[in-house]
Regions:
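Non-catalytic C-terminal accessory/binding modules of secreted extracellular proteins
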Residues: 143-144, 150, 160-174, 181, ...
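Short beta-strands within extracellular/lumenal beta-sheet-rich domains
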Residues: 555-581, 589-594, 626-628
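Extracellular carbohydrate recognition and processing domains
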Residues: 604-635
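Alpha-helical segments with a strong preference for the paired helices of cellulosomal dockerin domains
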Residues: 247-250, 673-696, 705-725
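Active-site-proximal segment of zinc-dependent metalloprotease catalytic domains
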Residues: 96-334, 338, 342-360, 431-432, ...
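Extracellular glycan-recognition surfaces and repeat-rich motifs
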Residues: 513, 523-557
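Extracellular carbohydrate recognition
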Residues: 646-663
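Acidic, divalent-cation-chelating loop motifs in proteins
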Residues: 235-239, 668-678, 701-707
């Protein structure tokens, strides 16, 4: 069920804008560096430092935008690179917001049209045969005279090395492999696709008629008609359901997915042919890309990255970049160059797209990650050669972590770095996967790379240990292994080390937690103090334990009532707290503000706690209640303090269900040297290797004589024999 959710969406999907900057020439001869953002439904250009620009249709200059009727239009000031700006230009930009984007409602309306009902994903990989149609426009032929041979080799040839340029002195343009090579490698031989390449055919449309993807249906239908005499489309209904399994269109010329290009050009995407039948079969899913990489005048043949990205949509895999840009609350931090379904398709001018990740292999059915649930030392080998990853389930249903090793070799040669990547995969919301919104909300990414150093841009410090030498991750680190809802996982990872062969070893600890809840239902009140279930509470400034009144006044019969300036303070805690939460109920007609603190042992000052969203001062509107969650580790012996900072002076708010989650010590098993929870022959082997000096271990001195030697091996064998009897 989970796998079906991860790959079973239906929509029109596209490659993200190429992240490479482009230098354009203004009409006066000056140059301007541009960056493109978004996809075929939502895109805009900025200067290198983030000021949005558009091309003025009247004079051809790129100018800083102005907002007119919720539309971005060319303003009056010609754009320049930062070092070339005049004082007047700098003054105008001082009050200009960076990364101004198209109106979110307009983008949402366009996206609503994408919810189509086509066939996606799960082919019989052994019976697959795809169709690729080369399509020229009436004003744009292919650059190579023999385009068919060029692209047939690029798509189908085994162990493809590249092609010879058509320059006066031809040279090899090297590629890492063909489309076939890419999928054969990413599936570990499970999928060896064959594509019939036909054409080029010419359609009676201009390259500028595409209008990104807005007029794609007309172009696609024209291409199907033009190729009809060359193809029996029924041959590509491999499952016999009356619908062609897929068609890929490769259009001549450039694409609007590169900065500085005409926005009327086609934007590569995947979608559904809405209503077309030929040769007795209907058409369903299609995908398309363009011939050229970058600026069309450069005539650089595009690599295979865009084809692999768009064809992956046909296999049912969603986009993993932020598909609505600044909508849904702003721009999200996405996998970037670490994923084919984000910016990884563009690596090395798309000639070396990064390989499928553990998630993408899982979603396509190429590999199932091994679940880990026992403590121990594990090794994960580079996914390019092993096709393997590990899975750790969180304490939230349908949410888990994936671990994989990436090495800068083969398809991963152009990744930003190498080491172990850790991904959080959250499939608790079916809609975001079904409608291609996986990473739209910056406050809740459903597919998140846990970057080792907590960065937000692609770097060699993202993997573990990486250049940041980050060797551990657990529930209390940044990043951490908690669920999105703050629930702690039952494991921690430490001693992460990478070997020269690209393998990464790590130690997995299984951590148990105990939850303590104060609900004030059975407490003893003695003046200003309350003996609770796990600590004593001090009530200050009119705080008291009171019967709840109404639906929004607590959970149960009793809670701690609070007025403005009331405080609830704990005694010193007998244990470390990893997660602290409580509910604050405001049944009054006034807005309340609540703050939460802790004080470490021996300290006099209180430290303000930030909740899971990074907020110290939490506003609770009248008639509402909130759950405040804190993941800061509170040391043993600390106190906590809840303060109603502002609020009603006469009508009370209520604090209830104060919850502390604390770790329970994991008692070591004597003789369990590899930490897998068992004492067996593998521990004997580990001890012998330690005595020989091949490895270092803890707990090897089993007889307590201060040395680790052969006598400890005898002790270990006796423990093993005793555990088996």
């Amino acid at each position: 069920m989970l796998l079906g959710l991860l790959c079973g969406y239906c929509s029109a999907d596209a490659v993200v804008a190429c992240p490479d900057p482009s230098v354009v020439t203004q009409p006066d001869g000056s140059t301007l560096t541009l960056l493109l953002h978004g996809d075929e439904w939502f895109s805009f250009s900025t200067t290198a430092d983030g000021f949005t620009v558009v091309k003025d249709a009247d004079d051809g200059y790129y100018k800083y935008v102005a907002l007119q009727n919720n539309e971005l239009v060319a303003g009056t000031i010609v754009a320049h690179d930062a070092t070339m700006r005049t004082p007047v230009e700098k003054a105008a930009l001082a009050t200009t917001t960076r990364y101004l984007a198209p109106d979110a409602k307009t983008v949402a309306a366009k996206r609503a049209k994408r919810r189509l009902h086509g066939n996606t994903g799960r082919y019989d990989y052994k019976n697959f045969r795809g169709l690729v149609i080369l399509v020229a426009y009436n004003d744009c032929p292919f650059v190579f005279d023999d385009a068919h041979t060029l692209f047939n080799d690029m798509i189908n040839q085994k162990d493809y090395k590249g092609f010879m340029s058509n320059a006066q002195f031809p040279e090899l343009i090297p590629y890492t492999g063909s489309v076939r090579d890419y999928f054969y490698s990413s599936s570990a031989g499970e999928f060896d696709p064959a594509f019939d390449v036909v054409g080029p055919v010419t359609i009676n449309y201009s390259q500028y008629d595409a209008r990104q993807a807005n007029n794609a249906q007309a172009l696609v239908e024209a291409a199907l008609d033009a190729a009809d005499s060359l193809v029996n489309y029924k041959d590509y209904d491999r499952d016999g359901d009356g619908t062609v399994d897929m068609v890929f269109f490769l259009f001549a010329g450039g694409g609007s997915n590169f900065s500085g290009n005409d926005s009327r050009l086609l934007w590569p995407h995947a979608s559904t042919v809405l209503s077309k039948s030929l040769d007795g079969v209907r058409f369903g899913r299609y995908a398309c890309s363009t011939e050229l990489y970058g600026r069309p005048q450069s005539k650089i043949i595009d690599g295979i990255g865009t084809i692999c990205h768009e064809f992956s949509h046909v296999l049912g895999i969603a986009d993993l970049y932020d598909t609505d840009g600044t909508g849904s609350g702003g721009s999200s931090v996405t996998p970037g160059k670490w994923s084919l379904m984000a910016q990884g398709s563009y690596l090395n001018q798309s000639r070396t797209p990064c390989t499928y990740s553990a998630y993408e292999r899982y979603a396509a059915g190429f590999s199932t990650p091994e679940k880990l649930n026992k403590k121990g030392t594990y090794i994960v080998n580079p996914i390019t050669s092993s096709n393997k990853g590990y899975r750790l389930d969180s304490n939230t249903d349908n949410e888990f972590f994936l671990l994989e090793s990436r090495k800068q070799e083969g398809w991963d040669a152009y990744l930003p770095g190498e080491g172990m990547l850790i991904w959080r995969v959250d499939s608790t919301n079916a809609d975001v996967w079904e409608y291609n919104k996986v990473n739209c909300n910056p406050k809740h990414s459903y597919y998140q790379l846990l970057r080792a150093t907590g960065g937000t841009t692609d770097s060699d410090a993202d993997p573990f240990p990486g250049t940041g030498n980050v060797t551990a991750i657990d529930n209390t680190t940044t990043p951490n292994l908690c669920s999105w809802n703050g629930r702690m996982s039952d494991f921690g990872i430490s001693e992460i080390a990478r070997s020269a062969d690209g393998s990464v070893s790590f130690k997995l600890a299984v951590q148990q937690y105990e939850t303590q809840v104060e609900d004030f239902e059975d407490v003893k009140v003695d003046g200003s103090t309350v003996k609770g279930k796990f600590t004593t509470w001090t009530l200050k400034n009119n705080a008291k334990i009171a019967a709840t009144a109404g639906e929004n006044a607590g959970n149960g019969q009793y809670a701690c009532s609070m007025l403005r300036s009331s405080e609830l303070v704990s005694d010193t805690l007998a244990w470390e707290v990893n997660v602290f939460s409580y509910r604050f109920f405001n049944p009054t007609s006034s807005t309340s503000i609540v703050r939460t603190y802790y004080r470490q042992p021996g300290a006099t000052a209180w430290t303000s706690l930030k909740d899971e969203t990074g907020v110290e001062t939490v506003t609770v509107r009248a008639g509402t209640n909130v759950k405040l969650l804190f993941t800061t580790v509170i040391p043993k012996g600390s106190e906590v303090r809840i303060l109603e900072y502002t609020g009603n002076r006469t009508a009370p708010c209520y604090v209830d269900d104060i919850t502390f989650v604390r770790p329970v010590e994991d008692k070591a098993i004597v003789g369990d040297l590899n930490g897998d929870g068992n004492v067996d022959v593998t521990d004997v082997t580990m001890l012998i290797n330690a005595i020989l000096g091949q490895i270092q271990i803890e707990g090897g001195d089993l007889n307590g004589d201060g040395n680790v030697d052969v006598t400890d091996v005898t002790s270990e064998i006796n423990i093993v024999l005793g555990s088996q009897n």
